[in-house]
């Protein structure tokens, strides 16, 4: 079973990630969010450790890694301006970081993240709202206007 940690567990898009983790048979073992709106996650993963402070979350992931129980995937659902630092945190403790778009706000940050993808370390991006009905309608209207 693959293990997951989630940064930004109380955000708008987080429930979709929680459902996806459950759908693939994964186990959400750690969640970071400064707001304690975690009831949804408790319902699906009652044993997940919850942290309000980044430092404690960092320490928890470090402890798991030293015990040989490193997290398989770290998912970033935090506000856009935090993506860069959260991706860096994720790559310290996992080979796989999944981040909603945009990965970063500045091009030079993208280049520095690319340099961190060494060995098995990978950063994946998700277009989390691409199937949202409003986005689909906008896409359809755009196509109709250009055909």
Go through the PLM ranges and name each one:
Residues 28, 71-74, 147:
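Local beta-strand N-terminus motif with an aromatic residue
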Residues 14, 38, 83-84, 106-107, ...:
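Short, well-ordered alpha-helical microsegments
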Residues 19-23, 88, 92, 115, ...:
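Short, well-ordered alpha-helices that flank and scaffold nucleotide-derived cofactor binding pockets
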């Amino acid at each position: 079973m693959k293990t997951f940690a989630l940064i930004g567990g109380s955000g708008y898009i987080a429930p979709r990630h929680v459902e996806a983790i459950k759908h693939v048979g994964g186990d959400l073992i750690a969640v970071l969010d400064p707001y304690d709106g975690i009831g949804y996650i408790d319902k699906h993963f009652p044993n997940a450790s919850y942290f309000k402070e980044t430092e404690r979350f960092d320490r928890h992931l470090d402890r798991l890694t030293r015990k040989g129980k490193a997290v398989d995937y770290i998912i970033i659902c935090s506000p856009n301006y935090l993506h860069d630092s959260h991706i860096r945190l994720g790559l310290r403790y996992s080979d796989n970081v999944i981040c909603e778009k945009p990965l970063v706000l500045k091009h030079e940050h993208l280049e520095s993240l690319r340099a961190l993808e060494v060995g098995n370390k990978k950063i994946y991006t998700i277009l989390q709202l691409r199937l949202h009905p409003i986005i689909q309608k906008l896409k359809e209207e755009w196509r109709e206007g250009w055909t």
